[in-house]
Amino acid sequence: MRFFLSGYVGRRIGETFPWGTFVVNVSGAFVIGTAAGLGARLGGIFSTTIFHEFIMVGLLGGYTTVSSFCLQSVNLMLDGEQRQALFNIVASALLCVLAVAAGYGGIMWIMEWPG
């Protein structure tokens, strides 16, 4: 899944910057935040060790890719693209944290709706 989405985004937006990895990591962070919110709000299966280890660490951790992000940042620096490398590092870290918070907060907000 990561390979196909990353490749698709790269072909659509361009490959002079690692947009594919960027999109994969931010979307994965959002889904991990959503899963954590489900565990905190609903409990049950969503708060079990197996859910945490298999879904969050295994599947979603395997979907996102810190190693590719790091290598691409170093390659940008080696290619003389220090600004793009810095943007990649700062924007990835910031947006991934915000995406986790948005996923988590979104679940908390939705689950408080009267219904």
Curated annotation (Swiss-Prot):
UniProt-listed GO biological process terms: cellular detoxification of fluoride
GO molecular function terms listed in the Swiss-Prot or TrEMBL record: fluoride channel activity; metal ion binding
Regulation: Na(+) is not transported, but it plays an essential structural role and its presence is essential for fluoride channel function.
Cellular location(s): Cell inner membrane
Keywords: Cell inner membrane, Cell membrane, Ion channel, Ion transport, Membrane, Metal-binding, Sodium, Transmembrane, Transmembrane helix, Transport
Binding site for Na(+): 61, 64
Function (record text): Fluoride-specific ion channel. Important for reducing fluoride concentration in the cell, thus reducing its toxicity.
Family: Belongs to the fluoride channel Fluc/FEX (TC 1.A.43) family.
PANTHER family linked: FLUORIDE EXPORT PROTEIN 1-RELATED
Protein name as annotated: Fluoride-specific ion channel FluC 4
Organism for this UniProt entry: Brucella melitensis biotype 1 (strain ATCC 23456 / CCUG 17765 / NCTC 10094 / 16M)
Lineage of the species this protein comes from: Bacteria, Pseudomonadati, Pseudomonadota, Alphaproteobacteria, Hyphomicrobiales
Name of encoding gene: fluC4
